[in-house]
Amino acid sequence: GLFDIVKKIAGHIASSI
């Protein structure tokens, strides 16, 4: 769902830090 996309983006950002 939409939340899954948000989590995926959030995970990518966290991985970038």
From Swiss-Prot:
Record PTM Isoleucine amide, positions in chain: I17
Any one biological process term the GO annotation gives: defense response to bacterium
Keyword Secreted annotated: yes
Keywords recorded for this protein, A-Z: Amidation, Amphibian defense peptide, Antibiotic, Antimicrobial, Secreted
Residues spanning the membrane: none
Alphabetized InterPro entries for the sequence: Aurein_antimicrobial_peptide (IPR013157)
UniProt KW Secreted keyword: yes
Expressed in which tissues: Expressed by the skin dorsal glands.
GO cellular component: extracellular region
Predominant localisation class: secreted
Localization per record: Secreted
Record-stated family: Belongs to the frog skin active peptide (FSAP) family. Aurein subfamily.
Function in brief: Has antimicrobial activity against L.lactis, L.innocua, M.luteus, S.aureus, S.epidermidis and S.uberis. Probably acts by disturbing membrane functions with its amphipathic structure. Shows anticancer activity.
Name used for this protein in its record: Aurein-3.2
Source organism of the structure: Ranoidea raniformis (Southern bell frog)
Lineage: Eukaryota, Metazoa, Chordata, Craniata, Vertebrata
